[in-house]
Design a protein with these regions (language model features):
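Long, leucine- and charge-enriched amphipathic alpha-helices
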Residues: 97-101
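Structural signal for interior beta-strand "rungs" in well-ordered beta-sheet cores
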Residues: 1-92
Length: 101
């Protein structure tokens, strides 16, 4: 039981080593979270989300369903369903590749 609100981790969600999850977070079902990922407080992570190692999720965000977040990314705004994002700040993978050619 959390002091502010409960942090909830869904069924079949895998957390690797050194993952930091702050208060009031809700992580959906069937997610894979690689090592050294950090979640600030009060964010909502949907179902079927994959987060690469050393990514950071800012507080008070909504990460949709069926999302892929690249390793080392810094997510500072909401991510809509069925997206692939990468970089710092995290942006749609198509734009990340175009900007880093």
């Amino acid at each position: 039981r959390g002091s502010l609100s409960n942090t909830i981790i869904g069924k079949n969600t895998f957390l690797d080593n050194q993952v930091h999850i702050a208060h009031n977070n809700k992580i959906g079902n069937n997610c894979i979270i690689a090592g050294q990922v950090g979640f600030a407080g009060s964010s909502s992570i949907g179902d079927n989300v994959i987060i690469g190692g050393q990514a950071g999720i800012a507080g008070h965000l909504r990460i949709g369903n069926n999302i892929q977040i690249g390793g080392g990314s810094g997510v500072i705004k909401d991510v809509p369903d069925n997206s692939k994002v990468m970089g710092y700040p995290a942006k749609d993978l198509r734009y990340f590749i175009k900007d880093n050619k």
